[in-house]
Amino acid sequence: MYIKTLMAAAVVSVLAVSGARAELVTQSLPKPDMVGGKTLMQSLQERKSVREFGRLAVNDQTLADMLWAAVGVNRQDGKRTIPTALNSQDLTVYVLKFDGVWQYDARGHKLIQVSDKDLRPLLGTQDYAKDAALDLVYVSTSDVATNGAMHAGSAYQNVGLYCADKGLNN
């Protein structure tokens, strides 16, 4: 866990340096698809980690649904799909893809490009990790280290269940 935290911190540091862009690039996401899907128990049964990924890009609807599952706003009062200690909502999700690094704006349900560089190779040393179409990096601004880890774990689990529901490897 410590190594992964250091790697994520390194990626975020690179983002801070490389993120200075002349113009702000945003990408609106489609509304989350709330229809259909497997039962929770089926998704739990099928949830697993794998070491094989296709090189196909993830379409916008799938990415929108995945990010909404991670930390999306699911109530009128602005609360999220994951619980956060004292409703701190201190977790930010970054999407690393071939076309750069994008920050997920949960309130606006959109992506904001923070770098146009493909930083995915910085995340993993295993060969299989390089084949993933995208990586999600969870960054917490919580002053309490355990809260950030707890929030990231909740978001990660939601994404895992979403992927199981859709038959996606994660």
Say what each PLM segment does:
Residues 8-16:
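Bacterial N-terminal signal peptides
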Residues 1-7:
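Bacterial N-terminal signal peptides that target proteins for export
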Residues 6, 52-53, 144-145:
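Short small-residue beta-strand/loop micro-motif enriched in glycine and branched aliphatics
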Residues 47, 66, 93, 134-170:
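Small-aliphatic-rich amphipathic alpha-helix that forms the alpha element of a beta-alpha
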Residues 13, 72-73, 166:
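Short alpha-helical scaffold segments that flank and stabilize functional sites
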Residues 22-132:
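N-terminal amphipathic, basic helical "cap/leader" segment at the start of enzyme domains
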